Amino acid sequence: DCLGFMRKCIPDNDKCCRPNLVCSRTHKWCKYVF
């Protein structure tokens, strides 16, 4: 299961849906990185 943009997540545990979506350690949600 994966999470979409700005969905709450647990760093190092949850997987965000796209390769350039990562779980932010600061905000604890999936955000885009470029």
Swiss-Prot record:
Name of the protein described by the UniProt record: Toxin GTx1-15
Something else known: The mutant [Phe5Ala]GpTx1 may be used as a tool for probing Nav1.7/SCN9A inhibition in vivo.
Compartments where located: Secreted
Entry remark concerning the domains of this protein: The presence of a 'disulfide through disulfide knot' structurally defines this protein as a knottin. This toxin is amphipathic in nature with a hydrophobic face on one side of the molecule (composed of residues 5-Phe-Met-6 and 27-His--Phe-34) and a hydrophilic (mostly cationic) face on the opposite side (composed of residues 10-Ile--Lys-15 and 18-Arg--Pro-19).
Residues found modified as Phenylalanine amide: 34
Effect of residue 21 to A: Decrease in activity on hNav1.7/SCN9A, hNav1.4/SCN4A, and hNav1.5/SCN5A
Effect of residue 22 to A: 4-fold decrease in activity on hNav1.7/SCN9A, no change on hNav1.5/SCN5A and 1.4-fold decrease in activity on hNav1.4/SCN4A
Family recorded in the similarity comment: Belongs to the neurotoxin 10 (Hwtx-1) family. 08 (Gtx1-15) subfamily.
Tissue expression profile of the protein: Expressed by the venom gland.
Bilayer-spanning residue ranges: none
Outcome, altering residue 15 to A: 3-fold decrease in activity on hNav1.7/SCN9A, no change on hNav1.5/SCN5A and 1.7-fold decrease in activity on hNav1.4/SCN4A
Sites annotated Important for activity and sodium channel selectivity: 5, 26, 28
Effect on the protein of changing residue 7 to A: 10-fold decrease in activity on hNav1.7/SCN9A, no change on hNav1.5/SCN5A and loss of activity on hNav1.4/SCN4A
Top-rank taxon, per record: Eukaryota
Disulphide bridges: 2-17, 9-23, 16-30
Alphabetically ordered keywords of this record: Amidation, Calcium channel impairing toxin, Disulfide bond, Ion channel impairing toxin, Knottin, Neurotoxin, Secreted, Toxin, Voltage-gated calcium channel impairing toxin, Voltage-gated sodium channel impairing toxin
Effect of residue 27 to A: 11-fold decrease in activity on hNav1.7/SCN9A, no change on hNav1.5/SCN5A and 1.5-fold decrease in activity on hNav1.4/SCN4A
Reported impact of residue 20 to A: 8-fold decrease in activity on hNav1.7/SCN9A, no change on hNav1.5/SCN5A and loss of activity on hNav1.4/SCN4A
This protein's GO CC annotations: extracellular region
Function: Potent voltage-gated sodium channel blocker. Potently inhibits the voltage-gated sodium channels Nav1.7/SCN9A (IC(50)=0.58-10 nM). Also shows a moderate activity on Nav1.1/SCN1A (IC(50)=6 nM), Nav1.2/SCN2A (IC(50)=5-128 nM), Nav1.3/SCN3A (IC(50)=20.3-170 nM), and Nav1.6/SCN8A (IC(50)=17-20.1 nM). Shows an unclear inhibition of Nav1.4/SCN4A (IC(50)=200 nM to >10 uM), Nav1.5/SCN5A (IC(50)=140 nM to >10 uM) and Nav1.8/SCN10A (IC(50)=68-12200 nM). Weakly blocks the low voltage-gated calcium channels Cav3.1/CACNA1G (30% inhibition of the peak current at 9.8 nM).
Molecular-function GO terms, alphabetical: calcium channel regulator activity; ion channel inhibitor activity; sodium channel regulator activity; toxin activity
Site (Important for activity): 6, 27, 29, 31-32, 34
PROSITE patterns linked to this entry: HWTX_1
